[in-house]
Amino acid sequence: ACFESCIQSGDRIILSRPSFAMYEVYSKVYGAKVTWLDYEKSENGPLLEVDRVVNTIKKIRPKMVCLPNPDSPSGTVFSYLDLRKIVDAAADIGSLMLIDEAYHPLYKDTSVPWIHECKNLVVARSFSKAWGAAGLRVGYLLANKELTALLHKQRPMYEIGNVSAKAIEILLDYEKDMMQSVKRVIAGKKYFQNAMKDLGMHSYDSH
């Protein structure tokens, strides 16, 4: 919806790489000019420094900045303070800021509380990860009223099917079960990391 509503051919956008593959596809569909921010190698794993992101925003002055947090497949995250610096830098030049929180609440930090204060911010979420409902193809956006009204202008007549809508409605009654599942996934990740360490192998932190 953000690409369809806000991006025209020739508009500049900033994307991280590697990241969710469909962002590159959307960029090509709508004719956007992409400035890639490639992760660099560091002692602690893949790294994308906040100052580099902010400086690129100021230099390129893109129509939109799109950053998953956590990113995939790197599993990297921006801290709460660093992410706010990026959002503010985008706001200073009038850029739309799209933060993809598809993995929430597997990663608890969220930028949703900023949506009323940061008029340029859109947060995307999905039922495909923690909720385990990837086959339903259901997600949602959170933004302030002005941005929501803009996005509604490009709202398709047929969004999701009745079966998917009803399934999500039922799923929402099982939030406690979902959170228990999240705890098991996180515990399993720690178990796997410890097992690798016992085998003499190193693993980087991933969210």
Which residues does each predicted region cover?
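Phosphate-binding glycine-rich loop
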Residues: 1-12
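Short beta->alpha connector loops at strand-helix junctions that form conserved
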Residues: 17, 36-41, 101, 125
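Conserved coil-to-alpha-helix start sites within the AMP-binding
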Residues: 20-22
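PLP-dependent aminotransferase class I/II
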Residues: 24, 120-204
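Active-site pre-lysine segment of PLP-dependent enzymes
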Residues: 28, 47-60, 73-130
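A short helix-loop-beta submotif of the ANL/AMP-binding
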Residues: 30-34
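Short beta-strands and strand-loop turn motifs
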Residues: 35-38, 63-71, 97-99, 204-207
